[in-house]
A protein has these predicted regions:
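N-terminal loops that bind phosphate or other acidic moieties
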Residues: 1-169
């Protein structure tokens, strides 16, 4: 038994492509896409997410980790989890979709439990403190008194936990 993965994306093609990529690196892990709407448009579908979660839960599951692309996909995934008989078996990862999915799939392939799979996905986004000094600085930031590494260099974005304008756009 391994941890199962569910990919929730606004785009069916993105979900399918991300699953295809991760499956190349973790052939024994069940990875299910739940992308797009039922009528083929961009958006999320509560029914698609619930179906993927139910399918993943039906297959000797050691837990399910869900990865999402954008904010409303998170809300859809959270809503779907609330409808499950055992919502405690599902963890939502706060990670970039493609990179996080690949890391999660490899961790699941290696036998990690659901918390370890979630942690692997999230470590892609937030490197462990021990590795921060090895990350190339993104800018010189005198107001912080240090070089930003693996974080937004825009001061207003840093104050908002990474949400803010992107320089040069």
């Amino acid at each position: 038994m391994t941890v199962k993965l569910v990919v929730v994306s606004h785009s069916e093609k993105i979900a399918d492509g991300a699953v295809e990529l991760a499956a190349q690196m973790a052939p024994d892990v069940l990875i299910l896409p739940a992308g797009g709407t039922d009528d083929g448009r961009i958006g999320t579908s509560l029914e698609r997410v619930m179906a993927a979660l139910e399918q993943a839960g039906d297959v000797n599951s050691d837990g399910i980790v869900v990865l999402t692309d954008l904010g409303s996909a998170v809300m859809t995934a959270e809503s779907a989890v609330e409808f499950l008989a055992d919502p405690s078996s599902v963890l939502l990862a706060d990670a970039p979709l493609v990179e996080g999915l690949v890391a999660a799939a490899v961790a699941a392939q290696a036998g990690a439990d659901s918390a370890g799979v979630k942690e692997a996905a999230e470590a892609v986004y937030r490197p462990p403190a021990a590795l921060v000094q090895r990350i190339a600085p993104t800018a010189n930031a005198p107001p912080r008194g240090r070089l930003p590494r693996g974080e937004d260099r825009e001061e207003s974005a840093a104050a908002l936990a990474g949400i803010g304008p992107t320089p040069g756009l």
